[in-house]
């Protein structure tokens, strides 16, 4: 089997290659013109893109995955069972439409489509676990059961420093974005029961408060689900590795096992996620 994912995936390139994940890139546009962003571009190019994202004079947008790019990816594994797994459909209805069209018009591919129901770090921890299961030789029927379990027991929480992102996406008024930025407010978001929909869970003044909240939410979830262990990914965009590594260290000191990795964002589809954040996606296991 072969795993295909979109570049919303926040794994670093070395991990993508080690897990043999085929990644299809979301197109990126700067002021209407195509911008050469990719998961394997050097860090200097990622830093340059982040500055472009922060510049309010620029309009940086993405579009859905392109039909020709999906077909090219599937063609590489035409003789295999393909697990094509993508972030929550509500995040990109255009991608959902293109995927449906490709699946309908190309019966020569043996494809199983999976909607991960999650975004960024949570999407990433799901894809990573699916790719590991495939690499370890898990049979298809068992894999689909595992996918359902992982998806229904995964949560996404994050700290957003770019309050103007919340304004751009309609989650915050302009006045509050201006005042909040001046006061250095950090917004906290969480996944909800509605797949792909993030909701506000408050605001904090510093990363210590943010990480305290994240730890408490995880502990509460573990109690509610009678969890025994956790698998997690922290993704970072912008200068927030100090915050992310503090969270990783604290996760490692909890009373239950937490397997967690920190990954630098690939940046390739971040216009709708803001250029300054770190987030945590985790799956709780009761076995």
What are these regions (language model features)?
Residues 2-66:
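N-terminal glycine-rich anion-binding loop in soluble enzyme alpha/beta folds
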Residues 3-5, 84, 113, 234:
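Structural beta-sheet core signal
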Residues 9-33, 90-103, 109-112, 118-287:
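Mixed-charge interfacial surface used for oligomerization/domain docking
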Residues 55-66, 87-91, 115, 119:
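Short secondary-structure transition/capping motifs
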Residues 61-68, 208-212:
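Conserved phosphate-coordination/catalytic loops
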Residues 64-105:
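Active-site cofactor/cluster-binding pocket
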């Amino acid at each position: 089997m072969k795993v295909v994912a979109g570049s919303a995936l926040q794994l670093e390139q070395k991990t993508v290659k080690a897990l043999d994940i085929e990644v299809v890139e979301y197109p990126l546009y700067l002021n209407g013109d195509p911008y050469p962003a990719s998961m394997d571009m050097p860090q200097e190019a990622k830093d340059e893109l982040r500055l472009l994202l922060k510049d309010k004079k620029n309009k940086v947008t993405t579009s859905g995955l392109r039909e020709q790019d999906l077909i090219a990816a599937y063609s590489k594994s035409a003789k295999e069972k393909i697990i094509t797994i993508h972030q929550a459909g509500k995040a990109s209805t255009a991608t959902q439409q293109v995927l449906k069209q490709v699946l309908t018009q190309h019966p020569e591919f043996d494809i199983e489509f999976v909607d991960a129901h999650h975004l960024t770090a949570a999407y990433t921890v799901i894809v990573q676990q699916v790719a590991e299961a495939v690499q370890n030789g898990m049979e298809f029927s068992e894999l689909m059961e595992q996918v359902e379990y992982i998806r229904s027991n995964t949560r996404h929480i994050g700290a957003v420093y770019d309050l103007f992102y919340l304004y751009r996406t309609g989650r915050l008024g302009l006045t509050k974005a201006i005042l909040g930025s001046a006061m250095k407010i950090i917004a906290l978001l969480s996944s909800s029961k509605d797949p792909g929909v993030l909701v506000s869970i408050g605001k904090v003044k510093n990363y210590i408060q943010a990480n305290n909240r994240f730890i408490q939410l995880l502990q509460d979830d573990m109690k509610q689900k009678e969890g025994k262990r956790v698998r997690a990914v922290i993704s970072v965009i912008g200068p927030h590795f100090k915050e992310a590594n503090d969270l990783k260290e604290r996760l490692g000191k909890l009373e239950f096992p937490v397997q967690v990795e920190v990954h630098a964002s690939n940046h390739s589809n971040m216009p709708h996620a803001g250029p300054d954040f770190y987030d945590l996606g985790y799956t709780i296991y009761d076995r």
